[in-house]
């Protein structure tokens, strides 16, 4: 978990420079998280604080009392618009939000351009709207009998499976809903497991920091309606953006920063979710879409 210094020529940078890598916590929680936690000021807070970096992997660090506990979960690429039928990364023409009002489906796109796909914020917004309008149930299944007459955007493929038709060439399927459900289950189960391991309750956490580029584009409404975050965190969320980059700047500008980051990484205890005896039950519970959050 210690920092290391290497010749910059090893990684294609100016040959007479030295490159310092920041310390990490484990093979699953790297130096980007150490830098991010340091930049957030989490360790200076006298209350219980949760730091979450959301990407293809979800890394979390919980500060409770004078202890630090970390874990990592496999979120998957769905929240970044990948592994989705018509998904794409955020860019011009990406659908970034949906609304269902009076049984009609509307959307907005990045740059107000013609829709060409759905990015991560749009993927979450779609599931949020489907839940709000009871089009999908707690298991993520589209309620065919109840909805097929009420919404003209519900269509059926050749095998009779329902899907959401946005445009002729842009759609959202049950498999896409499942990908979001798996991502939601991973993040929420990680949070629940951390809290359980720390022997505190969700309500005992006073601040939740969301880091990473993805987090700042997602509305609070989407986070809580879909259930990525428990309702106990409502009004406690703060978006920090790219904390890894901020931490790297701090390491360059403050001669004590790297030493402090090393202390932080050594102090943080990492545990694997799969090693928890009851993790299967925690994950199964976290998979379900909960109507209480809507």
Regions found by a protein language model. Name each.
Residues 20-24, 76-84, 107-114, 172-176, ...:
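Short beta-alpha connecting loops at secondary-structure transitions
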Residues 56, 143-153, 204-214, 264-275:
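A glycine-rich phosphate-binding loop feature that marks nucleotide/adenosyl-phosphate handling sites
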Residues 2-5:
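Short, small-residue-biased leader/transition segments that mark boundaries at the very start
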Residues 16-33, 250-294:
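Acidic, glycine/GT-rich loop-and beta-edge segments that sit at the periphery of enzyme/chaperone cores
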Residues 36-37, 57-60, 69-70, 77-79, ...:
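Flexible loop/turn segments at secondary-structure boundaries
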